Amino acid sequence: LLGLFGKRKATLVLGLDISSTTVKLLELSYTGGRYRVESYAVSSLPQDAVIEKSVNDVEGVSNAIRTVVAQSRTKLKNVAAAVAGSSVITKLIDMPQGLSEDDMEIQLTLEADQYIPYPLEEVAIDFEVQGPAPDRDNQVEVLLAACRRETIESRVEAIEGSELVPKIMDVEAYAMERAFSLVRNQLDLDEESTVAIVDIGATMTTLSVLSDGQTIYTREQLFGGKQLTDEIMRRYGLPLEEAGLAKKQGGLPDDYEPEVLEPFKEAVVQQVARSLQFFFSSSQYNDVDHIILAGGVSSMEGLEELVREKLGTPTSVANPFAQMSISSSVNAVALGSDAPAMMIACGLALRSFD
């Protein structure tokens, strides 16, 4: 079985988030009722090493993982990584109460082809008991998750190639839920609040809507910070690396803000609004209580206010580390600016304390 949920006694694991343009690594500890950031690092990936969430260049990804391990100076070897929700099929199934894990595994393996549209030899499956089945006596509700082996294997290969040990392969949506539980405490949101997390990465934007802390809707679309970088390259004739730096550090001509940056921010707001419309039209909801912006783009100055003002919904930028202590060896300023992009890495590192 896959270990998507990692049914084993908790060991300390590094959270390793492999996105389309970067590898992010995070190590947490927990003492005296408080989490502490022990080490972290972010490294960029070679172009096209990961395409739309699939590892395309195993060696390129391995090298980037080696870089973050060296930068972070972590001593840990065990890793929790994740696959994108779009590559995982999940189904809730009822099963007889009182079955042992082994019996469940046998029965699910026999019945899995009813639920999964791929040949069974091509998929890895895992399951987790959710609790008693509502309205059905002597039955439990079981979450079955299946993912194509090649999706997992390319990630496993990249991790092993960097001399780390892949202990847990999670799903990004579940990692996001775990990190959200930290953010929710800071925002004083009710348990039952409906919250939209908009994770804007370099090439992908993922909307996750959570109610009662559980994901009830996700949607991925191709849109991200790379569009801004591409526009800087096109307009000012800069190579990729310089454009990326200028975007972060400034030094672009005066027309950059009004002509490039502001229209990009407006485009972000439109993407958020459109994603939410898709959610509203496919559910009985017609509003959300709070919007949380995550991902590298979200810390862009003024974006939080713009989303709040245009959509009329309380909005904040994710910082999973706000209530954590930080080791003296960690650059707290850098961590603060990377924080919104570290949600998935954080949710994965939290697997240490299952």
Residues covered by each model-derived region:
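Glycine-rich phosphate-binding loop plus the immediately following alpha-helix
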Residues: 50, 150-178, 214-254
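Active-site neighborhood for divalent-cation/phosphate handling
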Residues: 82-184, 290, 320-326, 341-344, ...
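Glycine-rich phosphate-binding loops at beta-strand->alpha-helix junctions
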Residues: 261-264, 287-316, 320-322
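Phosphate-interacting basic helix/loop segments used at nucleotide- and nucleic-acid interfaces
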Residues: 9-10, 60-73, 186-193, 274-279
